[in-house]
Amino acid sequence: MYIEQHSRYQNKANNIQLEYDDRQFHTTVIKDVLLWIEHNLDQSLLLDDVANKAGYTKWYFQRLFKKVTGVTLASYIRARRLTKAAVELRLTKKTILEIALKYQFDSQQSFTRRFKYIFKVTPSYYRRNKLWELEAMH
């Protein structure tokens, strides 16, 4: 009886350890992917490419990314691109169109629409304004 009970507890403990190891591994994979994304924000980042980089199918990677980060891959990439664009608006003399195209927006109009949605002001107003909108930055 004692051996049986001990064996069940040992199995549960082993399963918990395996789940923990699995979570740790997935978190490490996602951290590596986040770093890779950060260095490639000015490139086309298709779900297939990012999932392949991680070594998963796109379906599994989407679920894993959301589980680990709390946001979808597309939302994360868009937020990071907009934040980088906001910094460039302040620190460079590049045109809004140049910045929009650099960060993979189809047009200045689509960039302005997304930028205004996140930062609550247009890119041109943001560039002229002296205060940094840190709350909207991701």
Curated annotation (Swiss-Prot):
Keywords, alphabetical: DNA-binding, Transcription, Transcription regulation, Transposable element
PROSITE patterns referenced in this protein's UniProt entry, alphabetically: HTH_ARAC_FAMILY_1 (PS00041), HTH_ARAC_FAMILY_2 (PS01124)
Keyword match DNA-binding: yes
Annotation: DNA-binding region: 48-69, 96-119
Domain HTH araC/xylS-type: 31-129
Molecular function GO labels: DNA-binding transcription factor activity; sequence-specific DNA binding
Pfam families from the UniProt entry: HTH_18
InterPro entries: Homeodomain-like_sf, HTH_AraC, HTH_AraC-typ_CS, MarA-like
Protein name: Transposon Tn10 TetD protein
Species of origin: Escherichia coli
